[in-house]
A protein has these predicted regions:
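Acidic, surface-exposed loops and disordered segments
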Residues: 1-222
Length: 222
């Protein structure tokens, strides 16, 4: 599955046009199994919801052209230290897993009706929702910074580090800022992200992508 996720990482782009076709029972079951695994592993409360009523804000409805999608991942968990980062990491996994299973996704951190969604997953901190469904297209690659703009390595960078940076640059970030810096020394890697309302989520997404590209067995987060 790691190889499939790596391929999905290269193919996955934000999709805002969906064809309105609902998820099949098999697709929902496949996604729910992944949600359950992530919740158990990281002690989260992510939910896959079906909603005829749109959970989008006015801005979200404006950005989504064509037919609306009615399936969403609600990224939720107990309000604790690093919960945003943990949900960003898990959300990234779900996006790539959906892509690997022929579906498309859209992160909607700032474009959903928070009051309505809170009623669906009560008593938890909700950091974002992710639309999931059948896209009319596969989206387009986002503009990207260069490897030199976001990373440095003490000495000659090993292949795993370079592959990790390439993967991190494929990660979706809030308004495509890519406001991260990754530094390496030996097998130790540090990640810093410019402070902002979405920085925790973005940091988790970047970590997930870097690990897929570099291989978790090759380094340690410092």
């Amino acid at each position: 599955m790691t190889e499939q996720m790596g391929q999905a990482m290269k193919e996955r782009h934000t999709v805002r046009q969906f064809d309105g076709t609902p998820l099949t029972d098999e697709e929902k079951s496949t996604l729910q199994t992944r949600v359950d695994e992530l919740n158990k592993t990281y002690d989260l409360a992510i939910a896959l919801i079906e909603s005829e009523k749109s959970p989008l804000s006015f801005l979200g409805k404006t950005l989504m052209s064509g037919k609306e999608v009615h399936s969403y991942f609600v990224l939720a968990g107990e309000d604790r230290t690093d919960i945003d980062e943990q949900l960003g990491y898990a959300g990234s996994d779900l996006c790539l897993y959906a892509q690997a299973n022929g579906l498309n996704t859209w992160w909607m951190a700032g474009t959903f009706n928070r009051g309505y969604v809170k009623g669906l997953v009560q008593g938890k901190k909700i950091v974002s929702i992710i639309a999931v469904g059948h896209g009319k297209n596969q989206g387009v690659p986002h503009k990207s910074k260069t490897k030199e703009q976001v990373s440095s390595y003490e000495g000659e960078a090993p292949e795993w580090f370079n592959k990790g940076i390439e993967a991190a640059l494929l990660a979706p970030t809030a308004i495509n800022m890519q406001a991260f810096t990754i530094k390496g020394k030996g097998n130790k890697v540090t990640l810093t992200y410019k402070s902002g309302p979405m920085s925790g989520i973005d940091k988790g997404i970047i970590k997930h992508h870097f690990e897929l590209g570099a291989g978790k067995e090759n380094f340690e987060w410092a």
